[in-house]
């Protein structure tokens, strides 16, 4: 096992405890990121479905608005000059809010009307009904465009967040966790090898002590048999206490 396949660490009981804690932390992080990815994917699919529905509705609304414009021009004449002259400031404005999905911030756009209708009196002479219908259709078109912009922005943001989250999950699952597991296996192998070496060393020491003891006892027996070693005298057996008489 090369050094690149595992973390460079001195094998010890403390290192084993640290690696076990790191492995547990990596597994917990992987599980949390998977849950985050699932939540983002669920919201991503919901937004994708909503985008498809909004685009289909947008096509119908824009087609209806185009027909209304042609009808209004046919009835009321060319009113583009009047519309341009009455423009002072935007009546339809956009504000942005934020939505949070599993820690990912999504922008949400909303449209609102500000001020009075500058074209309220347009079409009093003729074509008033057609102009009112035209305004309603294009107001609906603006509403759908803002909603579609919000959905598509959220779509792109979620797509990038899901890719990043999945890359992190894959990195933890296929790189970090296996590397920690290989390091942990290396530490356990080294510690087991040390224990075997220590057991073998102690066993050899005991065997050597036993051999030396047996050799010493054998030499002592041989010296005793040759009379070189005298048996120690029993001092207690030779001593005789005098009788004490008390008058």
From Swiss-Prot:
Q: Where can this protein be found? A: Membrane; Cytoplasmic vesicle, Clathrin-coated vesicle membrane; Cytoplasm, Cytoskeleton, Microtubule organizing center, Centrosome; Cell projection, Cilium
Highest taxon of the lineage? Eukaryota
**Which is a Gene Ontology cellular component entry for this protein?**
cilium
A Pfam family assignment: ATP-synt_D
Record-level GO BP terms: cilium assembly; protein localization to cilium
Q: Which GO terms describe its molecular function?
A: proton-transporting ATPase activity, rotational mechanism
Looking at the keywords, is Ion transport present?
yes
Q: Does the keyword Ion transport apply?
A: yes
Keywords for the protein's UniProt record, in alphabetical order? Cell projection, Cilium biogenesis/degradation, Cytoplasm, Cytoplasmic vesicle, Cytoskeleton, Hydrogen ion transport, Ion transport, Membrane, Transport
- Membrane topology reported for the UniProt record: Peripheral membrane protein
The family note in this entry says:
Belongs to the V-ATPase D subunit family.
Q: What does this protein do?
A: Subunit of the V1 complex of vacuolar(H+)-ATPase (V-ATPase), a multisubunit enzyme composed of a peripheral complex (V1) that hydrolyzes ATP and a membrane integral complex (V0) that translocates protons. V-ATPase is responsible for acidifying and maintaining the pH of intracellular compartments and in some cell types, is targeted to the plasma membrane, where it is responsible for acidifying the extracellular environment. May play a role in cilium biogenesis through regulation of the transport and the localization of proteins to the cilium.
Q: How does it assemble?
A: V-ATPase is a heteromultimeric enzyme made up of two complexes: the ATP-hydrolytic V1 complex and the proton translocation V0 complex. The V1 complex consists of three catalytic AB heterodimers that form a heterohexamer, three peripheral stalks each consisting of EG heterodimers, one central rotor including subunits D and F, and the regulatory subunits C and H. The proton translocation complex V0 consists of the proton transport subunit a, a ring of proteolipid subunits c9c'', rotary subunit d, subunits e and f, and the accessory subunits ATP6AP1/Ac45 and ATP6AP2/PRR. Interacts with SNX10.
The name on file for this protein is: V-type proton ATPase subunit D
> What is the source species?
Oryctolagus cuniculus (Rabbit)
């Amino acid at each position: 096992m090369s050094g690149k396949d595992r973390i460079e660490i001195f094998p010890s009981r403390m290192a084993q405890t640290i690696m076990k804690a790191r492995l547990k932390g990596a597994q917990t992080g992987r599980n949390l990121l998977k849950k985050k990815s699932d939540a983002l994917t669920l919201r991503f699919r919901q937004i994708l479905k909503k985008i498809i529905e909004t685009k289909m509705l947008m096509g119908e609304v824009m087609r209806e608005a185009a027909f209304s414009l042609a009808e209004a021009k046919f009835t009321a004449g060319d009113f583009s000059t009047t519309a341009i002259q009455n423009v002072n400031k935007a009546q339809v404005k956009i504000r942005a809010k934020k939505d949070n999905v599993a820690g990912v911030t999504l922008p949400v756009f909303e449209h609102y009307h500000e001020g009075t209708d500058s074209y309220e009196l347009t079409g009093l002479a003729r074509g008033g009904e057609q102009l009112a219908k035209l305004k309603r259709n294009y107001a609906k078109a603006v509403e759908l465009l803002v909603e579609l912009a919000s959905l598509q922005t959220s779509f792109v943001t979620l797509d990038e967040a899901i890719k990043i989250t999945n890359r992190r999950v894959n990195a933890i699952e296929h790189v970090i966790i296996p590397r920690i597991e290989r390091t942990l296996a290396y530490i356990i192998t080294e510690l087991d090898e040390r224990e075997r070496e220590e057991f073998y060393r102690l066993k050899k020491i005991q065997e050597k002590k036993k051999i030396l003891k047996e050799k010493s006892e054998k030499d002592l027996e041989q010296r005793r048999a040759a009379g070189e070693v005298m048996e120690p005298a029993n001092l207690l057996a030779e001593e005789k206490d005098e009788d004490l008489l008390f008058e």
